[in-house]
Amino acid sequence: RKYYNILMKHRMWLEMKRVLDVIVAGIMLAVLIIPMGIIALAIRLDSPGPVFFRQARVTQYGRIFRIYKFRTMVDNASKLGAAVTVDNDSRITKVGAFLRKYRMDEFPQLFNILAGDMTLVGTRPEVPKYVKKYTKEMYATLLLPAGLTSRTSIAYKDEDKLLGEAVDEKSTDNIY
């Protein structure tokens, strides 16, 4: 409640941020539509399966939404190995490695921004199983929409390396 009251004092800024998100995401999609088409074709030619990876994530007020990314791993990768990917994971496709290196796999999230599920800069769009482990203070992050980028994403840009150093799933969970 305390954090909610703080945010409500800045309600006008949050509404202006939403307008800016829509304008910027729209412009970025207009610029990126042809490269995104080329990426989609490259994914289809590189490995069988869908072009997009879809996954349930948590956004503002704990609402579940479906995040979109370009698929960077073989189809049904979650059935072939750990939920967490690390460097040199054999499930990552050739095109996928390139997309991940330059963060181009996240371009489809611009559609999530237009839909109102995400914002350009916000909190990390987390998987529901990790949100269940949030502390009381961490739940305050759910007062804001999930972001395409965030302070956490920048601070842990080498997330694969960090997670690769975790010994088991329990220690991986503790990172979050």
What are these regions (language model features)?
Residues F53-R91, T152-Y176:
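Short, glycine-rich, amphipathic interfacial segments at transmembrane boundaries or analogous
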Residues Y4-E15, D87-R91, E106, G122, ...:
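Juxtamembrane loop-helix boundary motifs flanking transmembrane segments in multi-pass membrane proteins
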Residues A42, A83, M138-L142:
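Short, P/G- and charge-enriched loop/turn segments at secondary-structure junctions
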Residues Y4, K9-D75:
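A hydrophobic, helix-centered structural microdomain
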Residues N112-Y176:
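Hydrophobic structural segments characteristic of membrane proteins
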